Amino acid sequence: MLDFMDYIQLAFAEATSWNRDNSYSSLTATAQSLLDFSTPERLRVHISSLATPHFATSYTLGTVGLIDGSVSYLYSTVPLDNTPSRSALIPLRKLARGYRQVQPPVAPVEDWGWNSLLDGLGSFQSTHAGDGNTHVSLSQKATLLHATLHLPPPTTLNALFLRRISPTMQLSLAVCSTRGPPLSKSAPQASLLGQLCHDTGKYSNEYLFSTDNSLFGWRGLWNFGPDPRHPRDPSSPPVSLLSAGAEAYYSPVSSLIGMSTGLRFSTLPAATETPSSTTTTTPISTFPYTLTLILTPLTGSLSTTYSLRASPNLAFSSRFGFNVYSWESEMVAGCELWRRRRKPQHQQDDPADHDGLEWARRKMRMHDPDYAPPTAPAPAPVAAESDEGNESVLKIRVDQSWNVRLLWEGRVKELLVSAGVGLGPSSFSPSSWSVPASGSAQAGGGGGHAKSYWHGVGVSVSYSS
């Protein structure tokens, strides 16, 4: 489950119309959400609050052998008035990341005052004067400041500076500083990561620099198909999207070189929408699904993923990896199952409309020549009702060594709860394409892996206001 501060950062991206899907780093986001999820460690409590539309705080207390915790603060120049902050009102699908429906590329928003050098006070005064234009208050460069202090010693400080410098460009600076031992007189270890993103909708480029080993990097993504900046026929939206990307890294200090390339094919929401009129003859084509292919030439690694959303409440994903140099392979499969809140008896409609199989009935009716597609209702209320009806989700992940992870995430009264467990005959695969195993999975002496069937169990409880 996402932390509250990560949720606020996603709300900031939505408020500033930044498409996080149009990035090479998000190429395998769907498969990672279903296969590479992590389970809580022991007991952890989160208390958060969006005190004002511009300011948020979060406090964390955990027990992982020792008592530890963190304090986080966040400030945004963009007001987040429409962002639900109470844990009882936040849509669960916003926090429990599952199957990620890729959205079609969109053109950058051009109607903001991006050329202002300062967060102009006059813009806010004109709004209070009563002109009623909500975009006037946003006539500034959207900026986000975030800092987290991890305790106890050795304390670690993580800070983030995020700024939209133009409709197509975004700058982020991330700092990580760790204080040394109490008796050490050396300066704290610190590193800076700078990232400049350029997104035009048709393609995106990311330029990175890290002070750790003076690492330079580049990531790029290209979307095949029409350019969203020059729309042609808005009445026929695209039903699929093919994207190709690559990344490269180089460190002149350590003489390290890294690179990878990948493809992603995904269906878009228009592929499974209900026809809106009787003149529409396009049937429901398929389930929503996403295919990816990642190739790392220097290490000889090849990874493919296939994710499928079989129904609104059920999704599957699988991944196969192979290394041509070592002949090692990896196979991982996972799924998620959502449980919806049961409606009161007086609000229940036809049960056939809410069993998650309406897509199959529509698909069968499409083959009837006498069938006329009904007029589709407004999509916004349906989406809101779907978010409010989600009560919990169960995720399962298993690999070729029969290592199993179980994760349950749901709402209990006013609290958001995550509970997970890891089981298996051995530690998780140490291959380059899998998630590193936790420390509890590596327990045991000798030169080999410990044959432990219990990798750990944990519970995380969150409350926000």
UniProtKB/Swiss-Prot annotation:
This is Mitochondrial distribution and morphology protein 10. Belongs to the MDM10 family. GO terms for cellular component: ERMES complex; SAM complex. It is found in: Mitochondrion outer membrane. Component of the ER-mitochondria encounter structure (ERMES) or MDM complex, composed of mmm1, mdm10, mdm12 and mdm34. Associates with the mitochondrial outer membrane sorting assembly machinery SAM(core) complex. It comes from the Eukaryota. GO terms for biological process: establishment of mitochondrion localization; mitochondrial genome maintenance; mitochondrial outer membrane translocase complex assembly; mitochondrion-endoplasmic reticulum membrane tethering; phospholipid transport; protein insertion into mitochondrial outer membrane. Lacks alpha-helical transmembrane segments, suggesting that it resides in the membrane via beta-sheet conformations similar to those predicted for other outer membrane proteins and porin. The gene is mdmB.
